[in-house]
Amino acid sequence: MGSLESEKTVTGYAARDSSGHLSPYTYNLRKKGPEDVIVKVIYCGICHSDLVQMRNEMGMSHYPMVPGHEVVGIVTEIGSEVKKFKVGEHVGVGCIVGSCRSCGNCNQSMEQYCSKRIWTYNDVNHDGTPTQGGFASSMVVDQMFVVRIPENLPLEQAAPLLCAGVTVFSPMKHFAMTEPGKKCGILGLGGVGHLGVKIAKAFGLHVTVISSSDKKKEEAMEVLGADAYLVSKDTEKMMEAAESLDYIMDTIPVAHPLEPYLALLKTNGKLVMLGVVPEPLHFVTPPLILGRRSIAGSFIGGMEETQETLDFCAEKKVSSMIEVVGLDYINTAMERLEKNDVRYRFVVDVAGSELDN
């Protein structure tokens, strides 16, 4: 690894313990290597998994922890061997900042499935230093794990695409869920689900939103552009919709029954799990075997898919519904996120907040 001319100190907002409360934290960036870029953070989206990590709900958290993996910024320095980016370019950093680069997954541009992947925060860099995320003034990132923000994509809009956007884009491409006219269900209308609706519509699919109440029906159809809306508690309507969908993307991040949704699938239909559920899910097999249906999973996307997501959304003018907040509001934003009180994604204006640069 190379070294900086002088050690660079930055300020971020960190959790110190499982309470998850975030407060200012000053720390040193890792030393810049020949293939690294230094990114000044402009915006960073808030993801539900940030809450999970901050509160140690998976039992794997290390503190102090600076969260944030939907990072958009500007390149301020580059290493001696960086060819991909130039100083002054707008770039993004998603959920991972490293991998082994030699396994079967890495060789197929599926770095997110590498067993040696390095998370953007709450992990350890190759040099032994802790990774810290985007709720901070700057980051040092290997150029391989940085993507370019298209010129016609607003920076604040790009942030949610680096996690929520690629989370739905990747399975749609991998499982060939992009044929115009096919019928796709979106289960759950949160940060990931609302982008699922928009991206599916951009591919030309017929989209049905499935939710536990009708509170979001008007917005789902009139604002997001969904074609149909199902209330999962309405037994009669659910029965009428049986065997009507080619596939369902399940974005719910908490335990829930699967049988009611499997029944909505046509023969050979696929239910793709996208939510990180830390509890066991239970289901009986007849809905699967009697329709040759399948349950699959998908996790974010590789670096090529992440760039493709940004380019696709820029071309199709797919935008997120966001609420931009400052770092001084971040704890309130986390509380609201826990209550599902956001339409549909918080984005933190890091550069506009009072932090050392």
From Swiss-Prot:
Cofactor note: Binds 2 Zn(2+) ions per subunit.
Binding site for Zn(2+) 1: C47, H69, E70, C163
GO biological process per UniProt: lignin biosynthetic process
PROSITE patterns the UniProt entry points to: ADH_ZINC
EC number: 1.1.1.195
Keyword list, A-Z: Lignin biosynthesis, Metal-binding, NADP, Oxidoreductase, Zinc
Cofactor list: Zn(2+)
Residues annotated to bind Zn(2+) 2: C100, C103, C106, C114
Pathway: Aromatic compound metabolism; phenylpropanoid biosynthesis
Protein purpose: Involved in lignin biosynthesis. Catalyzes the final step specific for the production of lignin monomers. Catalyzes the NADPH-dependent reduction of coniferaldehyde, 5-hydroxyconiferaldehyde, sinapaldehyde, 4-coumaraldehyde and caffeyl aldehyde to their respective alcohols.
Name used for this protein in its record: Probable cinnamyl alcohol dehydrogenase
